[in-house]
C-alpha cells in the first residue's frame, strides 16, 4: 500500500528540477567558496547566484540575504543577535510562535533580558492592542510569524511592523510557512528581519536564510572564518544553497497556481469535515490556502494520526518539531481552546501534487477511523 502525504507544512519532497541543479555540486570536485582558485571562484559564483534567486523570491536585495543551515538557526540569530546589543530591554514574541523563536527569547532572560508573549484572540489573530501596551516598555525586538504552522493563520505583518517601528524597536517575522504558499515581500512587510527556509518549498534540508536590513546592528551567533559578511561563520553548503535558490525560483513562479489548487482541496476537505462533528480551528481567519487544523472531542490527536498512518495517510497532530510531545498544542491553548479538545487536534496540509480523489478517499477513511475509535473509547458517535 502506497501512502498519501498530507503533511506539507512539516517538510516537502525535493523537486527533481532542484535536485538537477544540485547534482553538479554533489558529484564533482567543488571548491570552498572562500578559496581564490578556480574551484573556489566557481563555488562562490554559485552561492551568489542562489543569493540573488532567494532575494528576488522574497522582495529583497541580494546583499540582505544571510544563509544559515536551518530556519531554527535563522530565528535564533534574529532574536538573540538583534537583542544582543540592547541588554536590559525586552524581547516580545507572539504566543503562537514556533519554539525556535519563543525558547531563545525566554533563554535570554538568564542573561538579563526580559521577554513576554503577545496574546492572540480566539481565532489566532494577534492582539495589536496588547502589543501597543507591551511596547510601552523599552523593547529591542518583536517577533511575529507571518503564517502559523498549525492553524495556517496569516497575520497582518505590515500593520504590526508599523506599530513596532513607531515604538523604536526592531521587527522580525518568521516567514518559513508563507514562502511558496502566498506572496512574500520583505519590502512590503516592512520588517527589519525575515526568516525563510528551503525544505518547506521543495528544496533540500540544510539551507535557510535570514533576510536582514543592513542598517540593523546584529551580533553573530557563530564565530570563525567570517563567512556571510562576518555574520554567520562556517563553510557554505554549496549544493544545498544552490538547491534553495532553484526552489525559490520555482516556488514564486507557481505560487498562484499552488494557492488556487490547494485551497480547492482544503475547502473540499473542510466541507466533508462538517459531517464528522469536528471543530475546525481559525476558519474565520485569513489562512494559508493549504492548511486545515481540526479536533475531535474525546479522541487523542496522536491516536487518530497513528490510525490514519496505518491506513496510508500521513498527517500530523501539530508542529513536526514538537510532535513527540504529549502536551496539547500551545497555539490552541493561546487561543483559549480547552486542553482536552486541544489534545485531539490534527493538522492536514496539502501540497501541489495532491488530488481531489485523494481528498475524497481520505475523507472516507477518516470517517471510518473516527467511528472505529469512538466505539473503542466509548465516545458517543
Predicted regions and their residues:
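Pyridoxal 5′-phosphate
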Residues: 1-381
Amino acid at each position: 500500500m502506497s501512502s498519501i502525504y498530507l503533511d506539507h507544512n512539516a517538510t516537502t519532497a525535493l523537486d527533481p528540477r532542484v535536485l538537477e541543479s544540485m547534482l553538479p555540486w554533489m558529484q564533482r570536485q567543488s571548491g570552498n567558496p572562500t578559496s581564490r582558485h578556480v574551484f573556489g571562484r566557481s563555488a562562490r559564483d554559485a552561492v551568489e547566484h542562489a543569493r540573488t534567486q532567494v532575494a528576488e523570491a522574497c522582495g529583497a536585495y541580494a546583499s540582505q540575504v544571510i544563509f544559515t543551515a536551518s530556519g531554527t538557526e535563522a530565528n535564533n540569530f534574529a532574536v538573540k543577535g538583534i537583542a544582543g546589543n540592547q541588554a536590559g530591554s525586552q524581547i516580545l514574541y507572539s504566543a503562537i510562535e514556533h519554539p525556535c523563536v519563543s525558547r531563545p527569547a525566554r533563554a535570554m532572560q538568564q542573561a538579563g533580558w526580559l521577554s513576554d508573549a503577545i496574546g492572540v484572540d480566539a481565532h489566532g489573530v494577534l492582539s495589536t492592542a496588547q502589543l501597543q501596551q507591551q511596547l510601552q516598555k523599552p523593547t529591542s525586538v518583536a517577533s511575529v510569524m507571518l503564517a502559523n504552522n498549525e492553524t495556517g493563520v496569516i497575520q497582518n505583518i505590515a500593520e504590526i511592523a508599523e506599530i513596532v517601528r513607531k515604538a523604536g524597536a526592531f521587527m522580525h517575522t518568521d516567514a518559513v510557512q508563507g514562502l511558496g504558499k502566498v506572496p512574500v515581500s520583505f519590502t512590503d512587510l516592512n520588517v527589519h528581519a525575515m526568516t525563510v527556509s528551503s525544505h518547506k518549498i521543495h528544496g533540500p534540508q540544510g539551507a535557510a536564510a535570514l533576510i536582514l536590513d543592513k542598517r540593523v546592528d546584529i551580533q553573530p551567533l557563530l564565530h570563525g572564518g567570517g563567512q556571510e559578511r562576518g555574520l554567520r561563520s562556517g563553510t557554505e553548503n554549496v549544493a544545498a544553497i544552490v538547491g534553495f535558490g532553484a526552489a525559490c525560483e520555482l516556488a514564486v513562479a507557481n505560487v498562484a497556481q499552488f494557492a488556487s489548487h490547494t485551497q480547492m482541496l482544503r475547502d473540499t476537505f473542510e466541507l466533508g469535515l462538517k459531517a464528522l462533528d469536528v471543530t475546525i480551528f481559525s476558519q474565520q481567519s485569513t489562512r494559508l490556502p493549504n492548511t486545515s487544523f481540526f479536533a475531535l472531542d474525546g479522541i487523542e490527536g496522536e491516536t487518530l494520526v497513528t490510525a490514519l498512518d496505518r491506513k496510508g495517510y500521513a498527517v500530523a497532530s501539530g508542529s513536526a518539531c514538537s510532535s513527540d510531545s504529549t502536551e496539547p498544542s500551545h497555539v490552541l491553548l493561546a487561543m483559549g481552546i480547552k486542553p482536552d479538545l486541544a489534545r485531539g487536534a490534527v493538522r492536514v496540509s496539502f501540497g501541489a501534487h495532491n488530488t481531489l480523489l485523494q481528498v475524497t478517499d481520505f475523507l472516507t477513511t477518516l470517517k471510518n477511523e473516527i467511528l472505529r475509535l469512538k466505539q473503542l473509547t466509548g465516545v458517543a458517535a
